[in-house]
Amino acid sequence: MVDHISPRASPGPIRSSQTRRARKLRDSCTSCASSKVRCTKEKPACARCIERGLACQYMVSKRMGRNPRAPSPLDSTRRPSESLPSARSEQGLPAHNTYSTPHAHTQAHTHAHSHPQPHPQSHPQSNQPPHALPTPNGSSSVSAIFSHQSPPPPVETQGLGGDLAGQEQSTLSSLTVDSEFGGSLQSMEHGNHVDFLAESTGSLFDAFLEVGTPMIDPFLESAPLPPFQARYCCFSLALQTLTHLFPHAPLGCQLRLTDGEDSSCNLMTTDMVISGNKRATDAVRKILGCSCAQDGYLLSMVVLIVLKVLAWYAAAAGTQCTSTAAGGETNSGSCSNSPATVSSGCLTEERVLHLPSMMGEDCVDEEDQPRVAAQLVLSELHRVQSLVNLLAKRLQEGGDDAAGIPAHHPASPFSLLGFSGLEANLRHRLRAVSSDIIDYLHRE
């Protein structure tokens, strides 16, 4: 007896994974895409990621349309009855299949009886089950289509006990119709509705896992949003320093807490201004010594800190026009306890209490206090001078980096002209404060 060949072993139009196209990478790397900046498209690492020390990764771009479906691992274990010959085939009886063609039925009846029958469908055998009869609108149309596309059966398989099953299985394997689709139709026509539902659900679920699974960006997954809490870095240090330079900012603010806290104007003395500015300049020097100083936004905050330090020095020297009198009383009454009476200038101007006090280790009387304060501030301006020189160097480096970036690009807050304007503004402000103090001392 000739061994029956399994339909899974017969060669067919099996799609190979090697014929798939090579996956195409995205034009922009993950870091540039998340920052919404133009990527230089250099692989394996772009120039922007190399400059900033970031991990440059190019993700796989998702092609349009459906991906070619890979063979499911469930095909080998889904229907074992298809790969094994049936008991009726071993005993010489024809196996019934809803995909059988009229030509195959004719050969089966010719092998079972000695005389040929022209219309085997109209005279079924008595030992066949009723559900194997072809329906007028169901299996007959499908059989007609498959018989039109199927090749003639091999000659060496005719006359054997399992010839019908082998012919039908070879016919099904040579068709271009999906095997899962054919198995589902066969289950429906045989009444196996439970198997049909299980197979269709599994195939749809496999297709969803292959096509519909979204691609997760590893950069966003590895770098979640930080919680709203205090973090020690150059940005937090700059913000904290800038906040300390605005002690009167809560006055008149609509967002401040109103649970009975004191909103009176706490005036600062000359010693407090000098010590506070010294801490601010030390913090700025630490920031400029860090690699974070290459960021344009951080440099903008540092420029604001230096300008505020110069404003406090001018107020402590008495060369700035303020609303504070020599005795600490205001001429407009803008520093009352009521927030509604606080003027807009009281929130931002630097108000220093000029009273006879201890300046360093010496006690100064009321007459010599303005002159001593001006001399003390003038001796402290060298800190700001060295700080401005260091900041100008950083601004020049930031301007060189921003030279190839358009003015409207969000990678930097200022263009090349903007950075040069910041440096010119700082030097002009420093010269103005020092010249005002020198002129004041000459008049005294």
Swiss-Prot record:
Compositional bias of kind Low complexity: 120-130
Assigned keywords, A-Z: DNA-binding, Metal-binding, Nucleus, Transcription, Transcription regulation, Zinc
Annotated InterPro entries: AflR, OAF3, Zn2-C6_fun-type_DNA-bd_sf, Zn2Cys6_DnaBD
Locations listed in the record: Nucleus
Biased composition (Basic residues): 106-116
Keyword Oxidoreductase: no
CDD domains, per database record: GAL4 (cd00067)
DNA-binding region: 29-56
Comp. bias (Polar residues): 136-149
SMART domains given in the database record: GAL4
Gene Ontology cellular component list: nucleus
One BP annotation, GO: aflatoxin biosynthetic process
Taxonomic superkingdom: Eukaryota
Effect of loss of the gene: Significantly reduces the expression of clustering genes involved in the biosynthesis of aflatoxin resulting in a subsequent significant decrease in aflatoxin production. Produces relatively sparse conidia and a very small number of sclerotia. Also affects the expression of genes involved in spore germination, sclerotial development, and carbohydrate metabolism. Does not affect the biosynthesis of cyclopiazonic acid (CPA).
Gene3D superfamilies assigned: Zn(2)-C6 fungal-type DNA-binding domain
Keyword Transmembrane in record: no
Region (Disordered) residue spans: 1-25, 64-174
Example of a GO MF term: DNA binding
Function as written in the Swiss-Prot or TrEMBL entry: Transcription factor; part of the gene cluster that mediates the biosynthesis of aflatoxin, a polyketide-derived furanocoumarin which is part of the most toxic and carcinogenic compounds among the known mycotoxins. Binds to at least 17 genes in the aflatoxin biosynthetic cluster, leading to the activation of an enzymatic cascade reaction that results in aflatoxin biosynthesis. Promoter regions of several biosynthesis genes are bound by aflR in a dimeric form with a 5'-TCG(N5)CGA-3' binding motif. AflR also recognizes 5'-TTAGGCCTAA-3' and 5'-TCGCAGCCCGG-3' binding sequences.
Assembly information from the UniProt record: Interacts with aflS.
Protein name listed in UniProt: Aflatoxin biosynthesis regulatory protein
Organism the protein comes from: Aspergillus flavus (strain ATCC 200026 / FGSC A1120 / IAM 13836 / NRRL 3357 / JCM 12722 / SRRC 167)
